[in-house]
Amino acid sequence: MNILIDILLVLASVIVFLLIVALFTKKGYSIHREIIINAPLQKVFDYLKQLKNWDNFNERATADPSKKNKFRGTDGIVGFIYAWSGNKKVGEGEKEIKAIVEGKSIETEIRFIKPFTLTGYTNMSTESLSDNQTKVTLSNASTLKYPLNILLLMVEKGIGKDMSISLSCLKNILEK
């Protein structure tokens, strides 16, 4: 019986410790990654504007080639919604085009449903460096409420890594 009480006390102590840490952990994140693509700005922007193309380079989307996709609206314009349902790594959610500044940026809202509920925001911006060179900046931001914000200590690095891989895949596709 004493062993059970000791185990419960240790477990309770760990939980209390994590809850205290979460009090002092930031509630949101904003991650930015960029890459230079050897292709004209218009070619890059036209490709990015079509959310259906994101399956070709997005690290998360490529993790489950058999996921189910649904589309609502016209791709490449504000209001288009791309929804997916896949394995545990991909989960379930939808992405909606919220704003487009032609030749400059595409803003989307991502609404995750499974394995957890979360709303995030993504911005893809393009900048012409020369006639045949474009800088692409990918930004991702969201917030987590207490006590789930403690997860930010672990996931921020992983999100940044996935973003870098996605941009490298995008570069490979557009430089062919």
List each language-model region with its residue ranges.
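Hydrophobic ligand-binding cavity/cleft-lining segments
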Residues: 2-74
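Glycine-rich portal/gate segments that line the openings of hydrophobic small-molecule binding cavities
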Residues: 3-5, 42, 56-57, 65-115, ...
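A generic structural signal for beta-strand entry/edge sites
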Residues: 4, 28, 103-105, 131-135
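Short, surface-exposed coil-to-beta transition loops
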Residues: 30-32, 91-95, 118-123
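Solvent-exposed, acidic/flexible segments
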Residues: 37, 47, 90, 156, ...
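Extracytoplasmic/secreted envelope proteins and their assembly/folding machinery
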Residues: 41, 48-54, 94, 123, ...
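Beta-strand/loop substructures that line and gate deep hydrophobic ligand-binding cavities in soluble
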Residues: 107-165, 170-172
